Amino acid sequence: GTKYKVVYEPNMEDYLLCHAAFVLPAAFACYKTDGDLKKLRGDTAYLNRMIDANIEGYRAIRNAGHTILPKADENFESAAYRRICLRFFKLMCATSLGKLCASDHAMNAVDEMSGLNRDMKAFFDANGADYPVWRALEREAGRYLQ
């Protein structure tokens, strides 16, 4: 045994919305760099824009009446949340963690990520959300997203 404890999440709809809001900005980064996140090493401005896009997504989800999950992300507009995310994204871009956590999946699941992005944008639009940073990162992803 790994002693890893599986935790059941009864509110799967909200969890999946939040997961998409966190994962898609990372996928955009993968597409911007053709799967080589190390190209973003040291590009703190871009990494902060990834966090901004994530926050836009979380804000839209919360404002539509959904719960932000996991609970640890509830204070997503705090400086502490930004610091944690920035550390994580820097680690992803400086080590093989980015390949394991994001780019391998994103680069082999372009159709899935494109569909997920379309669904998230439809959700944002249906709920009157503003998401300019998300749209900018999406444009920078280039030819990958359909």
Whereabouts are the PLM-identified features?
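NAD(P)-dependent Rossmann-like dehydrogenase/reductase catalytic/cofactor-binding core
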Residues: I51, I55-Q146
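Internal alpha-helical scaffold of NAD(P)-dependent oxidoreductase catalytic cores
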Residues: G1-P70
